[in-house]
Amino acid sequence: AHPDDEILWFSSILADAGKIILCFEDVPGNRHWSEGRRASTSQYPLPQLVNIALSEADIFHAIDWTTPVPSAEGLEIPGTSSGGRVYADNFRRLVDRLGDELDGCSNVFTHAPWGEYGNAEHIQVFRAVMAAAESSSCRVWVPGYVSNATVALLTACEVELGRDVITLPTNQALARDIATLYKANNCWTWYKDYQWPAQESFRVVSTEPVDEGAIWPVNHISIRPPAPPRQSPGLTRRLARRFRRLVNRKETGHGR
């Protein structure tokens, strides 16, 4: 979906992929990420990159991951914000463009229907790939990454997953090289100290009901919520002294 997702969730297959398709580029309200992504794709070390370059929908913080509601476009976006309208429009654009890009493909590896760590645009890309691949014989595979925010969505997933599972060693050298490019261009979106797992697994999506399950090793990510900003004790004391001085001035008639 986004620049850097390809090395976070698909590093093991990246170098051998016939196409590496990035869906989104500009980020509303974040000029540094937008410019950095354009610079990174122009400097990308692998030649098979395809950049659809849609603008993201501004909905990252709109989802309550304790009660996500699936929709045809991915997830329902609460409220009537412009981000929700962009999200719906992006789905239609993705289906059209991916239909062209996936023509003739035998296998496509894309985001999971629960969005890995929890990203509504990842889920949207999965839905768009499934819609685009509907009229072809292309097999769709999803990565085995899940977080504490999305494990419930994985458990309740209505998408049929087949028995075929592929487990491969991650390509950590390539992943780190491309991560360095994103970091140099100030558009790396993941944890700075992230350590890739030794392996990652992919499971095929079935278009028919599946009676039997499969053993599927998944990588679990613990999402760390951002810590609230903290004021230093010195700043707190200075603000308290200033407030007391203002109160004293009011009481003696010197204030405005």
Question: What is the predicted role of each segment?
Answer:
Residues 1-104, 131-138:
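Active-site rim/loop-helix segments in enzyme catalytic domains that contact anionic ligands
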Residues 77-256:
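Metal-dependent de-N-acetylase/amidase catalytic core
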